[in-house]
Amino acid sequence: SASVQCIFLADGKLTENLFMKVLILSTGTGEGHNSAAKAVKEQFEKRGIPCELADVLNFASDKAGAYGRRIYIWSTVRAKKVFAGAYRVGRAISSARLKSPVYFANALYADKLCSYITENGYDTVVMPHLFPAEAMTWLLRQHKLDVQTYFIATDYTCIPFTEETKVDYYFIPHEELTTEFIKRGIPAEKLVPTGIPVSERFLKLPEKREARGQLGIPADKSCILMMTGSMGCGKHDGEAGGADRRGYPSVYPGGNQ
């Protein structure tokens, strides 16, 4: 993927990959982060580079990790107005100098994460999620840790609290987001437009007619695929109803089932 190639270029390790050991940190608050993490891991492994994918919240405790995932999913699916309000508040209280409660919450497990990184000899940390980026920012301010750090943005915006992180490079979904990230305080020289990492298997897809046959979708009918984010966010109910009235067959996948 472009993100992995840029990591090699930044580290100067295109021909020295034997000295590279990668830790990818994500968490289960929305599966998109994990999908990006798995895609990056796939590319490192393809190149024979030692790589591990870990849930950063498990460094706090297994219970805390499970709790954090449940609260996030509840807030986005069951309490959308509350979540939207939190994002607005986040924009107001967070800056490169003023740190949010999210930053300090992730600092609580940073020492344990630091021990894990040093004991296992990782020299590269990749983060397709805000939480580990917050933890690593605190960690690097408190400890002299010789690692390269990379944040992968998996939203087509600069989400709240990104500006209070400090890592080596930020991989963003599109060059048109560059100005937004700069306005939020991310240095321009640290921004690398790479797109969002996806698995290589999406490059080897069946023909449309064959795929429809596998899914039981009529080959001669129009079909709309609706995709939402954060475990079901979005005004999809009304849109789905409109599609039904126009006579389109509809497919509603969800919950990773």
How would you describe each model-predicted region?
Residues 19-23:
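Extreme N-terminal starter segment of soluble prokaryotic enzymes
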Residues 27-36:
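A short, glycine/small-residue-rich beta-strand->loop->alpha-helix junction that serves as a flexible
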Residues 39-116:
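Conserved N-terminal ligand/cofactor-binding loop architecture of enzyme catalytic domains
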Residues 141-204:
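Active-site-proximal region of nucleotide-activated glycan assembly enzymes
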